[in-house]
Amino acid sequence: MPKESKGKSAVRGESSIDSPSRTGAKPYNKRSAPTTSNGPSSKSQHTSKKPRFEKPNPSGSSSSLPGASKIKASIRQTKRLLAKPNLAPGTKIEAERRLKSLESDLEVASRKQVEKSRASRYHRVKFVERQKLVRRIARCKRNLARLNSDKAAQDLDSEGEASDDDDEGYGNQRLKESKMSKEELTKMLRWLRELLQYVMQYPADLRYVALFPTAEEGPSPPDAKEKDKSRQMAYQHLERVKKAIDDGQISEEVEVELSSKHRTLKKLATSTGGSSNGTTPTTSQAKNKQKMAKKTDKTTKNKRKNEEPISDDDDESDEDAAGAGGVKGDDFFAQDSDDEE
C-alpha cells in the first residue's frame, strides 16, 4: 500500500514538471466547474426557497386606473389638441369624449389617494378606540351575567374597583357600571355596540372624529348640534349605523365578529357622496356623468352630420373611441391626429 501511494505522487510530480503551464502555480486554485451529475445542483437548491407572499390584485375597473399624475398629463395633452385651430370634426369629437372620461378617472384616482392617506393617518386612533370599546363591552356583559346569576353586590363592587384588562383612569366609571341596574346595562351595551360599529364602519374618505378626545373622559360621540362640518358628517354616519343595526344590515354583536377566527365583518355600502369638502363624487355618480356625456356627444354628432358631411373613416374612429375609458390601453396620441395640415 505505501509503495502505490509513492508511485502516484511521483507520477503527479512528473506531469506537473512536464507541463509548462502548471509550473509555479497551485494545482487546486482554479478548479473547473463540475460536470453534470445526478445529484441536485446549487441553482435548484436556491430556487427551492419559500416564495414571498404577494397581495392579490383587487378586483374592479377602478383598480386598473393609472396614477393621478399620468391622468393629468393626458388631460393636458388632450386640451392642447383641442386648442389647435382647423381640427378635423371627427378628431375633435373623439378628443372631447376622451377628455370627459379622463376627468372622471381623475376624480376616482384622487379619491383613492385621499382614502389611502387618511387610512394610514387614523389607523392607530381607530385601533386604540376599538380596543377600549371592546373592553367596555366585555365588562358590561360580565356585569349583566352577574346580575342574571343573582350574585351579591359586594362582588360587583370588588370587580369594579380594579381590573387588569381595562384602561387606566376609569375606576369611577367601573364603579358606576357595577352599580347599574339591568335595564341601564342593556342600554349601555347597545350604545357601546353602536359606537364600535361607528369605528369599524367609518368611511375611508372622511376625516375621523375621535370618540375619546381625552384619556380621562369616556366616549363622547358627535350629536345633532355640531357646527363643525367634519363632526356633522360623523354624526350622519352614526345615524346610518344605528339605522343599519335596526334593519339588520350589520350585526348587532360586532364584538363576536371581531373575536371570530375568520373575522367576517359585514360592511355598509358606500355611505358618503363625497369627501369632507363635498367635491369628490362616488363611482356611481361618475358613471352617470359618463352616460350623460355620451348622450350629449350623440346629439352634437347628429347635428354636425346634418351640417357638414363626415367621412366614413371619421365615423369608425368615433365608434372605436367610444369604448375607450381613460389612459388604460389608450393609443389616442399614437395615431396621426393632426389633420389640419
Curated annotation (Swiss-Prot):
Region (Disordered): 1-115, 151-178, 257-341
Compositionally biased region (Low complexity): 58-69, 270-284
Compositional bias ranges of the Acidic residues kind: 156-169, 309-321
InterPro entries linked to this entry: Efg1, EFG1_rRNA-proc
Localization, UniProt: Nucleus, Nucleolus
GO cellular component, one term: nucleolus
Transmembrane segment boundaries: none
Annotated Polar residues bias: 32-45
Chain's role: Involved in rRNA processing.
Protein name according to UniProt: rRNA-processing protein EFG1
Gene name for this UniProt entry: EFG1
